Amino acid sequence: MNIYDQLQAVEDRYEELGELLSDPDVVSDTKRFMELSREEANTRETVTAYREYKQVIQTISDAEEMIKDASGDPELEEMAKEELKESKAAKEEYEEKLKILLLPKDPNDDKNIILEIRGAAGGDEAALFAGDLLTMYQKYAETQGWRFEVMESSVNGVGGIKEVVAMVSGQSVYSKLKYESGAHRVQRVPVTESQGRVHTSTATVLVMPEVEEVEYDIDPKDLRVDIYHASGAGGQNVNKVATAVRMVHIPTGIKVEMQEERTQQKNRDKAMKIIRARVADHFAQIAQDEQDAERKSTVGTGDRSERIRTYNFPQNRVTDHRIGLTLQKLDTILSGKMNEVIDALVMYDQTKKLESLNN
């Protein structure tokens, strides 16, 4: 099937979806209605671009006819030639855009995510930087209209983040934040540094798609669940009733502790969300490691320990090492205005995928 047949098939399906979504039987079936609505939303941009592309093709045909019929009218002929030139340029742009829109979609792109941030090398400074990254993602989520919920956090004595786990919910969250997994390096003068020397610290970020129970079922026999009293500052027990939950996936040793909520059931539900995502991610990583290099992530190596980005405070500079992007906008990016970085990563990924398809 060539590209035009593919595009026509997408448009035909889009029109079929429009009819289905007005069918009373579909409307009354909430699950099916949501699935079809999601499919329609995912194809809308492709169909809109394809329809605009067909209009450009028609404009080219009309301009060519006009040039043939304009003999003896230099002004009309010149106008038609100019329109033909502009339309041919637009045709090339649409063809590139449509190739990208037809690229196979990551099945996780529309999912919510579990976001984990940890202070790594650098002690207190690494924990403080992990807090900066948390704020950056929270503010970016606000700009996207997403819901950002901190599910579990652990702070150190200077107010930094040793570890934080958050759920980010909304439209196409994974598609935009999936490139954030890896080691984030910071270069700055710590507040405790009297000599003004720049220190280098690292925080790690892990982005995992939320996994529904129907998608990945964990055998209850593979889980060990411990219930204990939640602890407050200084280690004192803050609840008379044991509400905190420790959940261990025995085959992998993956462990989750949850005590943020006031009830045991809510802590258990949140712990289950996280452990399901972590276990699914664990086995997905094993599968990815078994694939050849071409089938690994095109942005970076896919190695979770890979240094992906450096934040240099003295020079107000952010560098993404995977795509060679450097921006003198560190303050802007840390305030949540991440679109320039994320758009560049998406474009790079799409370009590499196109190249691999053409080879």
UniProtKB/Swiss-Prot annotation:
Cellular localization per UniProt: Cytoplasm
Positions of disulphide bridges: none
PTM (free text): Methylated by PrmC. Methylation increases the termination efficiency of RF1.
Annotated GO MF terms: translation release factor activity, codon specific
Modified residues (N5-methylglutamine): Q236
Keyword Cytoplasm applies: yes
SUPFAM superfamilies: Release factor
Pfam family, one: PCRF
PANTHER family linked: LD18447P
UniProt record similarity statement: Belongs to the prokaryotic/mitochondrial release factor family.
Function of the molecule: Peptide chain release factor 1 directs the termination of translation in response to the peptide chain termination codons UAG and UAA.
NCBIfam families, per database record: prfA, PRK00591.1
Name of the protein: Peptide chain release factor 1
Gene that this polypeptide is encoded by: prfA
